[in-house]
Amino acid sequence: MIESTLFPIVAKINEYLSNYILIFLLVGVGLWYSIRTRFVQVRCFGEGMRKFFGELNLRGGAQKSGMTSFQALATAIAAQVGTGNIVGASGAILTGGPGAIFWMWIIAFFGMATIYAEATLAQKTRIVEPDGNIKGGPVYYITTAFKGGFGKFLAGFFAVSIILALGFMGCMVQSNSIGSTMETAFGVPSWIMGIVLVVICAVIFLGGVQRLAAVTEKIVPIMAGIFLLGGLVILAARIQYVPATFGMIFRYAFQPQAIIGGGFGYALKTAISQGAKRGLFSNEAGMGSTPHAHAQANVAHAHDQGVVAMIGVFIDTFVVLTLNALVIICTLYTKDGPLAGGYTGDITATLGKTNLDQTAFGSVFGASLGAKFVAICLLFFAFSTILSWNLFGKINANYLFGRKNSKLCSVIYTIIALVFIFLGTVSGSDFVWELTDMFNNLIVLPNVIALFALTGMVIASLNEMQKDKLKV
C-alpha cells in the first residue's frame, strides 16, 4: 500500500530532477571547469595516458595505507563501468536513436574536466590519520567550501544519500542484475548465487581498503578485456557496416526524427536528453562517487590524480560504452539488421523480450552463447561496482559516526550491506529502483555546489603543478 502510494511520487521527483535540474547542473559544471582550466582534458590528456600506462610506475608496491594511483583509478573505473554501460547504451539508443551516442561523447568530454576537479579536491582536502587511515571524499571538500552549520548540513545530506543510493540500495540493484542474468543464462538458482556473492563480498569487505584495491586492480583489466575482445569480434564480423554505423551516429545526432519519429524539435530534444542523461550517470562525473577512490591514492601532487581520473571517464564512455553502442548499431540497425531502414515500430515485439545486447552479440555468437557472454560481462561489471560502491558508502558512514566509533560502524554497515546484496539477488522491486535513482540524483546537488565554490582551489593546484606549461 505504502509502496504503491509513494512510487508515482518518487518517479515524478526523479523525472523532474533528471530531466531539468541535474542535466543543467552537470553540463554546466563541466563547461565551467573546461573554460576555467582552459580545457585541461585536452592539454593534459597525454599526461594522463602516460601515467595510466605506467610511465611513472603508478602500480607501485604494497601499500600500508591508501592505494596506489592505479588502484584508485581501477576502483573508480569499477564503479563507473557497471551495468549502466550495457543498459545505458541500449537504453539511449532505444529512446533517442543512434544519434544519442554522439551526445554521450559530448557530455563525457566536458565530464573529464569535472572529474579532474573532483579528484584534485579529494586529494587536497583528504585527512591522513596517525594510524595511516585516509579519509577523503566530497564530504571533506564540502565542509572546506562551507564552514559552520550549512557545510555540516550539506555534507551530512550527501553522506546519508550516498549510503542509501550506493552502499545499500545501489548494491541491491547490482546484485539483482547478477542473480537474474546468471539464472537465465546458466540456470543457477538466484538464492545460491546470492549466498556465493555474499561470502565473496564479505571476505573482501572485511579485508579493508588494501584488499579491495588488490581485487579491483586485477578484476578491472580482466573484465574490460573480455568485453572489448567480444565487442571487437562482433565488429570484425560486421566490418563492412562499421563506417555506416559511425555515419548513423553523426547523422541521427542532428536528424533524429528519421529514426525515432515525431517532429524535428521533439526528436532532437529526445536524442540530446537521452544521450546526456545516460552519459552523465554512466561515467559518474559530477556525482561525487569516484572522488572517494581518488582520495585514497598516494601521489606526489593532487594534479597527478586529477589527470589520471580523466582517463576513467575516457575508458568508461569513449571505450566501453562506445564499443557496446557500435555493436548494437552495426548488428541491429544496419542494412540486414532487424531495426534497419528507419525502424519506428514496437522493438519488443520485433526482438522479443531479450535485451538489445543479447540480440546483438547473439547475431554473431548465436543466441545461447550471446546470452551467456552478456551474462558473464554483467557479472563482472556488477560485482566490481558492488565492491567500489560499498567502499564509498562505508567512508561516509564513518564520517557520520566519527573516528571513535569507526570499527563498530564498519561492522554494522558491512552486515547491513551484505543483507541488501543477498536480498537483491532473490527479489526485485521497481520501487527500490526508483528510490535508488532518487538518492543518486540527490547526491549530485551538494557535490556540484561545492565544486563551483572551490574553483579557486582547483585552479591554484593546476597552476602550482604546471605553472611553466599551463598558466591559467
Where are the regions a protein language model picked out?
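Extracellular/periplasmic helix-exit of transmembrane alpha-helices
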Residues: 116-126, 130, 232-248, 256-263, ...
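Transmembrane helix-loop junctions in multi-pass membrane proteins
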Residues: 5-6, 36-41, 84-89, 167-179, ...
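Alpha-helical membrane segments and immediately flanking helix-loop junctions
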Residues: 60-94, 121-124, 130-139, 143-145, ...
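Membrane-interface loop-to-helix entry segments
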Residues: 25-29, 36-49, 158, 175-182, ...
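Helix-loop-helix module between adjacent transmembrane segments
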Residues: 29-34, 107-132, 139, 143-176, ...
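Flexible loop linkers connecting adjacent transmembrane helices
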Residues: 39-67, 91, 97-100, 113-149, ...
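N-terminal alpha-helical transmembrane segments of multi-pass membrane transport
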Residues: 1-83, 93-100, 111, 422, ...
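Selective recognition of specific alpha-helical transmembrane segments in multi-pass small-molecule
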Residues: 110-118, 195-209, 220-240, 273, ...
